[in-house]
Regions:
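Extreme N-terminal regulatory/targeting segments of RNA polymerase sigma factors
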Residues: 1-4
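Short, charged helix-capping/linker segments at alpha-helix termini
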Residues: 10-18, 29-48
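Sigma70-family region 2
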Residues: 10-11, 37, 50-65, 85-86
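Hydrophobic/aromatic residues within well-ordered alpha-helical segments
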Residues: 20-24, 28, 74
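Phosphate-coordinating loops and pocket residues in cytosolic domains that bind phosphorylated ligands
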Residues: 22, 47, 71, 83-84
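Structural recognition of an alpha-helix C-terminal capping motif at a helix-to-coil junction
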Residues: 30, 44-51, 55, 64-76
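Arg/Lys-rich amphipathic alpha helix in sigma70-family domain 2
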Residues: 58-61, 75-92
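Internal acidic/polar
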Residues: 88-112
Length: 112
């Protein structure tokens, strides 16, 4: 781990942050791929992690734990994606039910 890049990135050096992330992309890809099956979801998790790391880098207390901190953020992002996907119900997976009009049309027009 390049502590020099971490220190520079914490001071606001965008190039140092980009180089730091370039060093970590392969590790992030491996971890995210273990959690997520879809490459688009993996890319989203990595992108969200990079953004979160950029926004919160100053909160990192010990530079030597940067990778652990970053991977924990990535895992949380992966879990968020999995949770969102779990809440989505696809219409092709719903049981077929009769349409309202078909079921009640004869009753509505029936003589009273």
């Amino acid at each position: 781990m390049n502590e020099f890049l971490i220190r520079k990135a914490k001071k606001g050096d965008k190039d140092a942050f980009c180089r730091l992330m370039d060093e970590q992309v392969q590790s992030m890809y491996k971890v995210a791929s273990a959690y997520l099956k879809n490459d688009e979801d993996v890319a989203d998790a990595i992108q969200d992690t990079i953004l979160s790391c950029y926004e919160n880098l100053k909160s990192l207390k010990q530079n030597r734990y940067f990778k652990t901190w970053m991977i924990r953020i990535l895992i949380n992002k992966c879990r968020d994606i999995l949770q969102r996907k779990k809440q989505i119900t696809y219409t092709d997976q719903l049981p077929e039910m009769p349409f309202y009009e078909e079921e009640y049309a004869s009753k509505e027009w029936a003589p009273v």
